[in-house]
Amino acid sequence: MSLISRLKAVVAGDEYLDDDFDELDYASEDELNDIDNFKNSPRNKNALANANPFDFMNNNRSSKVVGMPGISNSSSEVSLMEPRSFDEMPQAIQALRERKTVILNLTMMDPDQAQRAVDFIAGGTYAIDGHQERVGESIFLFAPSCVNVTSSSPEEASPSSVPTENTPQYSLGKNTTPEPAWGNSKLSAYS
């Protein structure tokens, strides 16, 4: 039936909707009698009256508990990586995404690439709200947010700094405030 013919049928008062409802499956009289008998049965009335609706909810709720993947209370996994190039850094990021702690030993890398690698992994660690800690010279610990990292040393470890062999180390001595560089012909801190 087209839209125009249906509109004409509505205006004329014809029985236009009977065609649509004839296709539906109605319950037979036997089925209706079975439903009435079930409702009127004294055994079923008492069972439904004595039932606690909260018991049904608790039974269903316990079956819907799903564990989170990657989290286990029994053990945590630590991945030790000794990369030789920056190309191996996505593996460390993937390990962090899988909630594994990563110890990165960068002693076999070129210092410039090692700095780049630490910056890359530190960015990934920051993105997942993780923690980073310098363990030793060119050795770093990166942990996901589900791992608590505590340090036994009283001083804070400097995050994401790779010392190089050719970098001179400067000391300001006992004076903690540096002297201004302007007006002085000789910089005592750099000589």
Curated annotation (Swiss-Prot):
Q: Kindly state which keywords UniProt assigns to this record, in alphabetical order.
A: Cell cycle, Cell division, Cytoplasm, Septation
Question: What Gene3D superfamilies does the record point to?
Answer: SepF-like protein (3.30.110.150)
Location(s) in or outside the cell: Cytoplasm
Report the record's Gene Ontology biological process terms.
Answer: division septum assembly; FtsZ-dependent cytokinesis
Ranges of compositional bias, category Polar residues:
166-178
* InterPro entries the record matches: Cell_div_SepF (IPR023052), Cell_div_SepF/SepF-rel (IPR007561), SepF-like_sf (IPR038594)
Q: Where is the composition biased (Low complexity)?
A: 151-165
Entry's Gene Ontology cellular component terms:
cytoplasm
Q: Which Pfam families match?
A: SepF
| HAMAP family named among the record's database cross-references | SepF
**Function, in words:** Cell division protein that is part of the divisome complex and is recruited early to the Z-ring. Probably stimulates Z-ring formation, perhaps through the cross-linking of FtsZ protofilaments. Its function overlaps with FtsA.
The family note in this entry says:
Belongs to the SepF family.
Describe the protein's quaternary organization and the partners it interacts with.
Homodimer. Interacts with FtsZ.
Q: Which PANTHER family does its entry note?
A: CELL DIVISION PROTEIN SEPF
Official protein name in the record: Cell division protein SepF
What lineage, starting at the top, does this entry show?
Answer: Bacteria, Bacillati, Cyanobacteriota, Cyanophyceae, Synechococcales
Gene responsible for this protein: sepF
